[in-house]
């Protein structure tokens, strides 16, 4: 399973649906996050100016055995095309941002379902987890 930054942030911030997202992660055989999505998650959490919350990201990744996947050249190409097709300003309802495009690319490259929060990826062909 690929995990988007939106799901990671929701779990760490204990947003209303965090438990459901956490349970889905717990049920997965393998968990992967793009290095770009890892950074995006860290930026959001660091912006809260709460050091304990920021530390939870790395603690959670280690605890659940999530693999931070390096961005490959192929993923960069897939992400570029995703932005053209689904990105902000494209007119497509998915309205993917920079970080979303890397989650999308990793899910496409690995042919894995993705866990996310929101409705952006629901407008693409990515399988929900």
Label the model's feature ranges:
Residues 104-129:
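Acidic, PIN/NYN-like endoribonuclease modules and their adjacent C-terminal/linker elements
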Residues 67-113:
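Active-site neighborhoods of divalent-metal-dependent phosphate/nucleic-acid chemistry enzymes
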Residues 1-33, 46-61:
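Short, well-structured N-terminal submotif of metal-dependent ribonuclease cores
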Residues 8-9, 38, 121-122:
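A generic structural signal for short hydrophobic patches within well-formed alpha-helices
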